[in-house]
Swiss-Prot record:
Coiled coil: 21-64, 693-720
Organism in which the protein naturally occurs: Homo sapiens (Human)
Membrane-spanning parts: none
InterPro entries linked: ZBBX (IPR037688)
Molecular function via GO: zinc ion binding
Name of protein: Zinc finger B-box domain-containing protein 1
């Protein structure tokens, strides 16, 4: 590598590394070629320039346009010269020839001396400036005066030169304003002299005129003059005046004496005592004028004491202060505090103004007095008779809260309302995030019957006896996860009377009517999209559980009443209800999923019958409160067993039923639809069946619906309650033919408070009907029942 190909770029700071920059060989070659090309162009231009110069020189030499000795010709007419010189051409020898050009001497015009002198004088003299000249540049007029230094400057010099460094804090004022102040004072003094001495000799008047002329000259001219000029003017004036003023002409001048005399003159003139010592006043005035001129030459600023002068038509300053101080004092004190004398020029006007202000103060004093008296008046006490409050707050004991401290957010319990004629059960399901607290929903007083205003205390307590029976009967560990909705305990219930004797009579009557009661074939509610109602499976003998189930179904029942205020008005005077409210603690069990759904043995079916029997005996009208639940119940996704399905189909053709047969049939169809919906989701592979069996099962279902419709009309006469109390059941009995589609729609219709109303009620069935299910059930019936269930899904799926 060649060092010429690198360029060293040293850095200024030591310690930095030297950077080398490599130059490309091609770039160097290109630069070399470009430089050579530029050199060639420059050489060509030089050659052309030389050639043109030589040509011009040759042309100039070849032409005969040159001066020759002894010949005079016109310079302008070149053709004329050429024509005359053709014959007289002189041939020169080869070599260098020297030529000398002769020029005519032209006489220049002589400039006048006056103009020359004026030009010189204009150059030497400075331009005239009106006023005082700037002390720095001496070319511009002074506009500002430095208060600290006392010198005059133009605006440019003061900003650029003077106001720098240590002098930047110096202040300035306008030069014109100060001069006006000084001249105003002098004018007043001379006017005073003229007024005092109108009959003095003319010489003295001439002297005053001269002094006044000097005063009226601009300040700049006066300031430019030196002290010698002032002395000359005073000497001339002193010669014209009387010999008594010779001391001033000699040069003896006392500044302090002149200042004191001037102050005395001013004080006497202001007070009006200017008739005494006229000569002294004149002498002091003359001294003052001379002193003023001397002060101007020495750049001293005239200062006089501050004097506040007020016009005669207004109050004096002290009077205003006095009024401001005593404006709130009473009128009696004002007369005592009035001063005896005021200044003479303001005496009359001051009295008038004082009278006006006193009147104003009198009005202010009256206002203040009225206000004070109003404030000091005794306050009248108004004795307002208040009636006794109609509302009283009664504090309850803490025992109610202590009972439910152990309860969690979700606590299942049932509320049973019993009647002698009919038995219906209601189960309620509430969400965790209910707007009412649990304790407030249970322990709250309600006022019913506007005439009597009876308080109803709905306190749900645990009964040990019922809990034992319930634990034995419901060994299937069913967890309904229900909470009582506080809206149910609204104005629907009018009176509740508790009596143990009524309960005993009710139990005996229900046991006597045990043989005539018919069991409801289904207890399945249409649920919301989020939750599905299921049942736990149990493996207990049928014989041990039948008697307990019958007793439990008779004891735990209530009269279904819809929570609406309109229905409470219709049943207010006729019904007398009693509430037997019992709450059962939650019984949880591990989730089993679809573990037993696909087991269809006869033994398994026999073991699974008690769960269906329990559900039939504990059949109730269920109102599910679909709220914002965070957890689903443990039995939400449990499917129904085959025994339950077969029992629901076999019990469809039962004995004549009560008035609620229409609702029972509708609930049966709804339960079958919900079961088939779940089966259709979980087991879609078993939907391929014969068309003949499908048509057969459809015909059977239509016949059953017609029979139930006829039974619904006859059962209305046997039932004691009117159709007004159960608007849902009467409306459902009219639409049993369309039950497969209507129940699917009504399942998603929610009433107020987000409640889904689900129908399901009935009575206990005979023991023989339940036993016959286990004996007559075979594998063939199981297959037939499965076929029926799958066929039922077909029209429902088509309709959707």
């Amino acid at each position: 590598m060649n060092r010429k190909d690198f360029v060293v770029l040293p850095w200024g700071k030591p310690g930095n590394s030297v950077k080398l920059k490599y130059r490309n060989a091609q770039e160097l070659r290109m630069e070399k070629v470009q430089l050579e090309f530029e050199n060639q162009e420059m050489e060509k231009k030089l050659q052309e320039f030389r050639s043109t110069r030589n040509k011009e020189k040759e042309d100039r030499e070849s032409s005969e346009y040159y001066w020759k000795s002894g010949k005079v010709g016109k310079l302008v007419n070149q053709s004329y010269m050429m024509s005359q010189n053709k014959g007289n051409v002189v041939k020169f020898s080869a070599g260098k020839v020297k030529l000398k050009l002769l020029k005519e001497q032209i006489q220049e015009p002589v400039k006048p001396t006056v103009n020359y002198k004026m030009a010189n004088s204009s150059e030497c003299e400075k331009p005239k400036i009106n006023g005082k000249v700037c002390g720095q540049c001496e070319n511009k007029a002074a506009l500002l005066v430095c208060l600290e230094c006392g010198e005059d400057y133009c605006s440019g010099c003061f900003a650029k030169v003077h106001q720098k460094g240590a002098l930047k804090l110096h202040r300035t004022t306008l030069l014109q304003a100060k001069s006006q102040i000084l001249f105003n004072v002098l004018d007043v003094a001379h006017q005073f002299i003229k007024d005092v001495n109108p009959d003095e000799p003319k010489e003295e008047n001439n002297s005053t005129k001269e002094t006044s002329k000097i005063q009226h000259k601009p300040k700049s001219v006066l300031l430019q003059r030196s002290s010698s000029e002032v002395e000359i003017t005073t000497m001339k004036r002193a010669q014209r005046t009387k010999p008594r003023k010779s001391l001033l002409c000699e040069g003896s001048f006392d500044e302090e004496a002149s200042a004191q005399s001037f102050q005395e003159v001013l004080s006497q003139w202001r007070t009006g005592n200017h008739d005494d010592n006229k000569k002294q006043n004149l002498h002091a005035a003359v001294k003052d004028s001379l002193e003023e001129c001397e002060v101007q030459t020495n750049l001293k600023i005239w200062r006089e004491p501050l004097n506040i002068e007020l016009k005669e038509d207004i109050l004096s300053y002290m009077e205003k202060l006095w009024l401001k101080k005593h404006r709130r004092t009473p009128q009696e004190q004002l007369f005592k505090m009035l001063p005896d004398t005021f200044p003479h020029p303001h005496e009359t006007t001051g009295d008038a103004q004082c009278s006006q202000n006193e009147n104003d103060e009198d009005s202010d004093g009256e206002e203040t007095k009225v206000q004070h008296t109003a404030l000091l008046l005794p306050v009248e006490t108004l004795n307002i008779e208040r009636p006794e409050p109609s509302l009283k707050i009664v504090e309850l004991d803490d025992t109610y809260e202590e009972e439910f401290e152990e309860a969690e957010n979700i606590v299942p319990y049932k509320v049973k309302l019993a009647d002698a004629d009919s038995q219906r059960s209601c189960a309620f399901h509430d969400c965790q995030k209910n707007s009412f607290p649990y304790e407030n929903g249970i322990h709250q007083h309600h006022v019913f019957d506007k005439g009597k205003r009876d308080f109803l205390n709905l306190c749900l307590r645990n009964s040990s006896t019922y809990y034992k029976d319930n634990s034995k009967a419901e060994t299937s560990n069913t967890d309904f996860d229900n909470i009582v909705d506080p809206d149910v305990y609204s104005s629907d219930i009018e009176k509740i009377e508790e009596s143990t004797s009524f309960e005993r009579n009710l139990k005996e009557k229900n046991i006597g009517l045990e043989s005539n009661q018919k069991s409801d074939d289904s207890c399945v509610s249409l649920e919301s999209k989020d939750t599905l109602l299921g049942r736990d499976l149990e493996k207990a003998p049928i014989e041990e559980k039948l008697s307990q189930d019958i007793k439990e179904s008779l004891e735990l029942s209530n009269l279904y009443k819809r929570p609406s205020f309109e229905e409470s008005k219709t049943t207010k005077s006729s019904l007398l209800l009693q509430e037997i409210a019992c709450r059962s603690k939650p019984i949880t069990k591990q989730y089993q999923g679809l573990e037993r759904f696909f087991i269809f043995d006869t033994n398994e079916r026999l073991n699974l019958l008690p769960s269906h029997r329990l559900e039939c005996n504990n059949s109730s009208t269920r109102i599910t409160l679909a709220g914002q639940k965070s957890q689903r119940p443990s039995t939400a996704n449990f499917p129904l067993s085959n025994s339950v399905k077969e029992s629901s189909s076999c019990l469809s053709s039962s004995h004549p039923r009560s008035r609620s047969a229409a609702a029972q049939s509708s609930s049966r169809a709804a339960s079958e639809i919900s079961e088939i919906e779940y089966i259709d989701i979980t087991d879609q592979n078993e939907l391929s069946l014969d068309d003949t069996t499908d048509q057969h099962t459809l015909d059977n279902l239509e016949k059953e619906l017609q029979v139930l419709r006829s039974l619904a009309d006859t059962s209305e006469k046997l039932y004691s309650l009117t159709s007004e109390e159960f608007p849902d059941f009467s409306s459902q009995s009219l639409n049993i033919s369309q039950i497969s589609t209507d129940f699917l729609k009504t399942s998603h219709v929610r009433g107020p408070c987000g409640v889904e109303e689900l129908s399901c009620s009935g009575r206990d069935t005979k023991i023989q009907s339940l036993l016959s299910l286990s004996e007559s059930s075979t594998d063939e019936e199981e297959e037939d029942f499965l076929n029926k269930q799958h066929v039922i899904t077909l029209p429902w799926s088509k309709s959707t």
